[in-house]
C-alpha cells in the first residue's frame, strides 16, 4: 500500500498514486462480469463498472470505514449511478427506490461520507454517487431509499408491490466494519474487500452441490425430515442462515459448531471440548418448527406470529456467541453450551476451498495466516469428522468448515446464504 495525498479542504484522493494494486480492482470487475455472465444466476445484463470508478469508490470507502463516530464504527453504502440515468435504470431493472436529490451535490470524499453516514441507515439507504460532467471528480447527488432485505422469519406477506422499494441493481459498496467492504448489486453479494484483498462470494453455499450436501446429509437423519421432507430442510436452512447473519451482527468474531446428538457423548469422552456455560432447558426451536410446518391454527396472523417467535429464539442463540469461546449446538440447532473451549491436536492435512455448485473451488485455502479462532476450529473438525463449523470473522466473512475425508478439510471462504447483503 502506498501513501496518499489529501486536499485539506475536501480530504479527497488526488494523488496519481493508488492505494491498492490494479489486480485487486480488476478482480472486483472480473467477479462482477463472471457473476453476470453465469446462466444459472439469472442476472440482468448491464454495463460493467469502469475501472476508474471502481477504484475511486473502493479507496474512498475504505478510508472512510477506518474512522469512528463517538467510538463506534461508521456504516454506510455507496451506489454508483448517474443522476440522469435513474429513470431508465428503474424502468429496465424493474427495481425502484425512493429517490431523494440533494439541492447541492456533495463532493465524494472521506469527509463528506463521515458527515452523512450518521444520517442514513445503510440497511435502507445508499448514497448515490456519480462522475461529474468534467469526468475527473465524483459527487454524492442524493440518497436511494429501499426496504431492508427480508428473510423467511421477518418478512410480512401480503405487501403492496407498487409501494415496495428495493436495492438498486448497480455497483454498491457498503461498509459495516473498519477496513471491510461489501461489493454487491441489488441483493446479491459479489464479494468482500478484507485486509487489502478481494474475496469472491460463494454463490448458494447451502446448495446440494456445495456445503449444503454436508448439511443435507445430517438433516436426513432428523426425525422432522422423515416427517416433513424437503419442507423441513428449507426451514432448517433458512434458520441456520438467519442464525449466522445474527451472529455476524452481534459479535466481534465467533465460532458455531454443529454436533450430531448421537456423537456428543463420544466427543465428551474424548474431551474434544471444555464446557463453560450450560442451561438446564432448551429454547424449543424444534417444537416451533413443527408448528410452522403443520400450519398454525387460524389465519395469516398465526403464521406471522410463529415466524416471529422463531426469529426471537434464533436471536437469543446468536447473542450467546458474543462471549469468548465457541457456541455448541446439536445439528438440530438445540443449545449444548456456550463459551466453550475446543480441544484437538494441530491438523496436519490439507484444507481446500469447497465447491460452490458452479464449478468453482478446489484451490488450497491458506488457513495458516488466519488467527487462533480459525485454526482451533480447523483442528477440531479434523478430529470430529461428522461435525460442521462456522467461523464468523470480525472483519466480515462467515467461513464454513467440514471434513471431506481423513486427510482433507473443505472451507468455504464466505458462506453467507444466497449472497444476500
Locations of the language-model features?
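Divalent-cation
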Residues: 3-421
